UniProtKB/Swiss-Prot annotation:
Keywords: Isoprene biosynthesis, Magnesium, Metal-binding, Thiamine biosynthesis, Thiamine pyrophosphate, Transferase. It comes from Nostoc sp. (strain PCC 7120 / SAG 25.82 / UTEX 2576). Its EC number is 2.2.1.7. Belongs to the transketolase family. DXPS subfamily. The keyword Phosphoprotein does not apply. It catalyses: D-glyceraldehyde 3-phosphate + pyruvate + H(+) = 1-deoxy-D-xylulose 5-phosphate + CO2. GO terms for biological process: 1-deoxy-D-xylulose 5-phosphate biosynthetic process; isopentenyl diphosphate biosynthetic process, methylerythritol 4-phosphate pathway; terpenoid biosynthetic process; thiamine biosynthetic process. This is 1-deoxy-D-xylulose-5-phosphate synthase. Thiamine diphosphate binds at H72, G113, H114, A115, G145, A146, N174, Y287, E370.
Length: 635
């Protein structure tokens, strides 16, 4: 059987180990070819090929439900659930998603994109099953990185107190999240993997057993069960933490040995109550370069399969915002030992790996634990440190109560640096940084700013460090800057709550925030071609808003347009409209941003065009709204 013939996971039933191994090779080939051509997550999926096949051969997927944590390791799952022929559309506009979505396929039982949610969801399904008198298996597959998240531990704590609720948790232990794991839980798991008795049994038992005359080969299918029993006798403390929490623990199991996996899962299905199967895998398995560099090959842009190197762009690009941020922060931290960079398992993505390499004592990685990261930063701030919490906009949502309760209510000087703010592209709706303006600006005491380009970002990093009277946040986008000149030192902080006028005109006032400032200027130039002159403001701050600048100009000009790369509801445009109403200035305000929709996966440019956020579309919308002009001249 060829992988392309599999349209239903139950077709794996009855396949021999040899046939499953052939399917595994085909999955890896398709996975590698697709990601090399189009980009995507590489290492996570390569590491769970045998785990997926072994687990699915023991389940009835017409009935049983498997919940994949995060979802970026579920490419093998997609390939055996009827999406082989569409796999070349992965993460592309109108193609299949890079994560799991309930609406995409009947075997995607729970959507995700963020970590640590699978056990809670699977437990909810298991409880509903029992309440409804149904019969199906509920399985959560979670990585050891995601297991460091508090939500996963909360779910384990709950499930362990439900001895009559059948639930299977498969722990995919590859010793990594995106970067190497940190904390006591990964260290405990690693000790179990490396326990000498476990290693001895793993390395020697099977080979010695097969050499027993007459019975060795005939009992080969039972080796998984026998090996599991031997490990539990030899190492009674293996899995003790999970056993104490109410789970039956099995493992560690070789995550690339199909015989052992199938035998273990079959045994696990016979056990009542919550069961945890600990599977040891290798991230990037089957692609040597990814096995050797598990951080670098977690996710890839298009690359050469032979060399592993990214396919170069046709033209040189300016530095990425994250790179400018990290470079500036390191420079400042070298001069100020009180600056402490904090990441929640995203050191490479946020650029804090540069701080770790240069000043390791001024760097903290808390693992996938955004709530802890924020309150840890608050604690550091109480003692005079300058904590810089660099967290993706979409992930900071997970710590909203801590932002309010632990930072803002106490007015502590924590500097939040929100990477990936705005439209992020092919990761889709779970990762779009659309909501931070709305969810932060409503909180008392916090200051919020966004740079128009990478040079202004450098000044905002200084502003955030020097602002010691309360919390402050800076949002910045994924991707590259504009190529404006940068300084190596001597950056001046900005005055809090002050914007700037970039262009003068009498016909319409355009106020841009962050990434929408340059498109504002470009739209103004297009409007000028039609005899309409715009004043353009770079707001810089949404809170406090520069009302001294904005209100008089709005009253004078009489037509206002706001631009933001965030949700319109409660966002920057709403802040401007509220300020004008509070000042009794009644003028029309056209708010342009992301409407009340989920932004699906596509390139950022494709998404912006679909949302009407290109400079030409902005000019068109202004013409239609205020000057009764048809769109054709600027379409």
């Amino acid at each position: 059987m060829h992988l392309s013939e599999i349209t239903h996971p139950n077709q794996l039933h009855g396949l021999s180990i040899r046939q499953l191994q052939q399917i595994a090779r085909q999955i890896r080939d398709k996975h590698l070819q697709t990601v090399a051509e189009f980009g995507g997550h590489l290492g996570p999926g390569l590491g769970v090929v045998e785990l997926t096949l072994g687990l699915y051969q023991t389940l009835d997927l017409d009935r049983d439900k498997v919940i994949w944590d995060v979802g970026h390791q579920a490419y093998p799952h997609k390939l055996i659930t009827g999406r082989y022929s569409d796999f070349h559309t992965l993460r592309q506009k109108d193609g299949i998603a890079g994560y799991l979505k309930r609406g995409e396929n009947k075997f995607d039982h729970f959507g995700a994109g963020h970590a640590s949610t699978s056990i809670s969801a699977a437990l909810g399904m298991a409880l509903a099953r029992d309440m409804n008198g149904e019969k199906f298996k509920a399985v959560a597959v979670i990585g050891d990185g995601a297991l460091t998240g508090g939500m996963a531990l909360e779910a384990i704590n709950h499930a362990g107190h439900l001895p009559k609720t059948n639930l299977l948790v498969v722990l995919n232990d590859n010793e990594m999240s995106i970067s190497p794991n940190v904390g006591a839980i990964p260290r405990y798991l690693n000790k179990m993997r490396l326990s000498p008795p476990v290693q001895f049994i793993k390395d020697n038992f099977e080979e010695q057993f097969k050499h027993i005359p007459f019975v060795g080969e005939s009992l080969s299918p039972e080796l998984g069960r026998i090996k599991e029993g031997m490990k539990r006798l030899a190492v009674p403390k293996v899995g003790a933490v999970f056993e104490e929490l109410g789970f039956t623990y099995m493992g560690p199991v070789d995550g690339h040995n199909l015989e052992e996996l199938i035998a273990t899962f079959q045994q696990a299905h016979q056990i009542a109550g919550p069961v945890l199967v600990h599977v040891a895998t290798i991230k990037g398995k089957g692609y040597e370069l990814a096995e050797k560099d598990q951080v670098g090959y977690h996710a890839q842009t298009p690359f050469n399969l032979t060399t592993g190197k990214a396919i170069p762009s046709n033209k040189p690009k300016p530095p990425a915002y994250a790179k400018v941020f990290s470079h500036t922060l390191v420079k400042l931290a070298e001069q100020n030992p009180k600056i402490i960079g904090i990441t929640a398992a995203m050191a490479t993505g946020t650029g804090l790996d540069k701080l770790q390499a240069k000043l390791p004592n001024q760097y903290i990685d808390v693992g996938i634990a955004e709530q802890h990261a924020v309150t840890l930063a608050a604690g550091l701030a109480t003692e005079g440190m300058r904590p810089v919490a660099a967290i993706y906009s979409t992930f900071l949502q997970r710590a909203y109560d801590q932002i309010i309760h632990d930072v803002c209510i106490q007015n502590l000087p924590v500097f939040f640096c929100l990477d990936r703010a705005g439209i992020v592209g092919s990761d889709g709706p779970t990762h779009q940084g659309m909501y931070d303006i709305a969810y932060l600006r409503c909180i008392p005491n916090i200051v919020m700013m966004a740079p128009k380009d990478e040079a202004e970002m450098q000044r905002m990093v200084v502003t955030g460090i020097e602002h010691t009277t309360g919390p402050i946040a800076m949002r910045f986008p994924r991707g590259n800057g504009y190529g404006v000149p940068l300084m190596e030192e001597g950056w001046e902080p900005l005055e809090i709550g002050k914007g700037e006028i970039l262009r003068n005109g009498d016909d319409v006032l355009i106020i841009g925030y962050g990434t929408m400032v340059y498109p504002s200027m470009q739209a103004a130039e297009i409007l000028s071609e039609h005899g309409i002159e715009a004043t353009v403001i770079n707001a810089r701050f949404v809170k406090p808003l520069d009302t001294e600048l904005i209100v008089p100009l709005a009253q004078k000009i009489g037509r206002v347009v706001t631009l933001e790369e965030g949700c319109v509801m409660g966002g920057f445009g709403s802040a401007v409209a509220e300020a004008l109403l509070d000042a009794d200035v009644v003028v029309p305000v056209k708010r342009i941003g992301i409407p009340d929709v989920l932004v699906e996966h596509a390139t950022p440019d494709e998404s912006k065009a679909e949302l009407g956020l290109t400079s030409r579309q902005i000019a068109e919308r202004v013409l239609q709204a205020y000057f009764q002009k048809q769109p054709s001249p600027v379409s």
